Amino acid sequence: MASGWDLASTYTPTTPSPQLALAPAQGYLPCMGPRDNSQLRPPEAESLSKTPKRRKKRYLRHDKPPYTYLAMIALVIQAAPFRRLKLAQIIRQVQAVFPFFRDDYEGWKDSIRHNLSSNRCFHKVPKDPAKPQAKGNFWAVDVSLIPAEALRLQNTALCRRWQNRGTHRAFAKDLSPYVLHGQPYQPPSPPPPPREGFSIKSLLGDPGKESTWPQHPGLPGQSTAAQAGTLSKGEEGMGTGPSSSSETPLWPLCSLPGPTIIEGESSQGEVIRPSPVTPDQGSWPLHLLEDSADSRGVPRRGSRASLWGQLPTSYLPIYTPNVVMPLATLPTTSCPQCPSSASPAYWSVGTESQGSQDLLCDLDSLFQGVPPNKSIYDVWVSHPRDLAAPAPGWLLSWYSM
């Protein structure tokens, strides 16, 4: 159609202006200002661009003296015998007077050198007048050229902390009496050490000192009946015989071969002596298991120590750990019909006699006073089908608690 609208005739392509075409390349955007390149950076680049700040090393072992280096140098020089010191001597004297300078901090030595050369009050005293430029010269101080404020306590962080807390000041307020008038200077006393907590040293103490264990006054043979029967909780199984304070062992278990018994007094007035304990590893003090009787027939129950039920036999001092202790034979007077523990009939290995089952029941009740042996218990548990008789009921109930 001639009269119709021609799309191709009306369409004219447009080309961008040179300014807009070059805008992205030059960092400009249309209708906007310059492009911010920092917003387009990845976060990793920002973290790398920021260098971490180094933490300042702090020296908190001792309080820094609240004095000027001029005052401290003048103090040690005036305290010298000839009122002069070398540089190395000044450094050593400052370290001796003020503990702060004994630490790892070394920068203060440069401050000493700087103050010696920059202050007019310090002057060199040549060691050899013919060689004034030689090293190792002495330094002296002219006290008339020292400013008065340089010898006073400075307004440091330490002084401000003292004022806020109201604590005792360890340093003198003014060094003028010590520098100008030659009074002896007393270094600040170190703070008291902190109170020690619980430690093994507090229990053991110093071997050179006397024992701190409580002593029980009294002569042998005059102890009370309570001491003759049983021991105190802290002294069970340990001897407390009469001895001087200098000979008292600090740790009684280390010097005694085994448990001993306190001497007591029977009801008849007879003094009961402790029975000897054999240090042999293969034997066991049988007198601790049975009640021996004296010649008059009076049982000596006062000499029996209450050791059973306190510790397993493997932990007693006369036996090494996990050593099987031989079972003690029971007294014949307590059970005349009971077979010996060493006989095969007792352990059901040999031929059993008539009524052996009843005897084992009696043994179960009689062995209530015998201490349990953990090593024997372990053997019984690990070998339940052994030929030997099963463990008594009291032993199983002892370790099942």
Curated annotation (Swiss-Prot):
Coiled coil: none
Motif, Fast/FoxH1 motif 2 (FM2): chain positions: 321-327
Motif (SMAD interaction motif (SIM)) on chain: 363-384
DNA-binding segment(s): 64-163
GO molecular function (one): protein domain specific binding
Keyword tags: Activator, DNA-binding, Nucleus, Transcription, Transcription regulation
Gene name, Swiss-Prot/TrEMBL: Foxh1
Name of the protein in its database record: Forkhead box protein H1
Segments of skewed composition (Pro residues): 185-195
Region annotation (SMAD-interaction domain (SID)) ranges: 307-390
Functional note: Transcriptional activator. Recognizes and binds to the DNA sequence 5'-TGT[GT][GT]ATT-3'. Required for induction of the goosecoid (GSC) promoter by TGF-beta or activin signaling. Forms a transcriptionally active complex containing FOXH1/SMAD2/SMAD4 on a site on the GSC promoter called TARE (TGF-beta/activin response element).
Subcellular location field: Nucleus
Gene Ontology BP term (one): regulation of transcription by RNA polymerase II
Entry superkingdom: Eukaryota
Motif Fast/FoxH1 motif 1 (FM1) per UniProt: ranges: 311-315
CDD domains on file: FH_FOXH
Subunit structure: Interacts with the MH2 domains of SMAD2 and SMAD3.
Biased composition (Polar residues): 221-230
Entry note about domains: The FM region is required for binding SMAD2/SMAD4 complexes. FM2 is more effective than FM1 and only interacts with phosphorylated SMAD2 that is in an activated SMAD complex.
Stretch list, region Disordered: 32-57, 179-251
Gene Ontology CC entries for this record: activin responsive factor complex; chromatin; nucleoplasm; nucleus; transcription regulator complex
